[in-house]
Amino acid sequence: SNTSHQDFHLFYGDNGMPVH
């Protein structure tokens, strides 16, 4: 349940922008 920062990179990437 520690996917807070991981989910951020998965969805927003390194630039903090939505990868979708």
From Swiss-Prot:
Chief location category: mitochondrion
GO molecular function: cytochrome-c oxidase activity
UniProt keyword Membrane present: yes
Enzyme class label: translocase
Presence of the UniProt keyword Mitochondrion in the record: yes
This protein's GO CC annotations: mitochondrial inner membrane
Disulphide bridges, residue numbers: none
Compartment annotation: Mitochondrion inner membrane
Biological pathway: Energy metabolism; oxidative phosphorylation
Keywords: Membrane, Mitochondrion, Mitochondrion inner membrane, Translocase
Similarity annotation: Belongs to the cytochrome c oxidase VIIb family.
Subunit structure: Component of the cytochrome c oxidase (complex IV, CIV), a multisubunit enzyme composed of 14 subunits. The complex is composed of a catalytic core of 3 subunits MT-CO1, MT-CO2 and MT-CO3, encoded in the mitochondrial DNA, and 11 supernumerary subunits COX4I, COX5A, COX5B, COX6A, COX6B, COX6C, COX7A, COX7B, COX7C, COX8 and NDUFA4, which are encoded in the nuclear genome.
Function comment: Component of the cytochrome c oxidase, the last enzyme in the mitochondrial electron transport chain which drives oxidative phosphorylation. The respiratory chain contains 3 multisubunit complexes succinate dehydrogenase (complex II, CII), ubiquinol-cytochrome c oxidoreductase (cytochrome b-c1 complex, complex III, CIII) and cytochrome c oxidase (complex IV, CIV), that cooperate to transfer electrons derived from NADH and succinate to molecular oxygen, creating an electrochemical gradient over the inner membrane that drives transmembrane transport and the ATP synthase.
Protein name (Swiss-Prot/TrEMBL): Cytochrome c oxidase subunit 7B-heart, mitochondrial
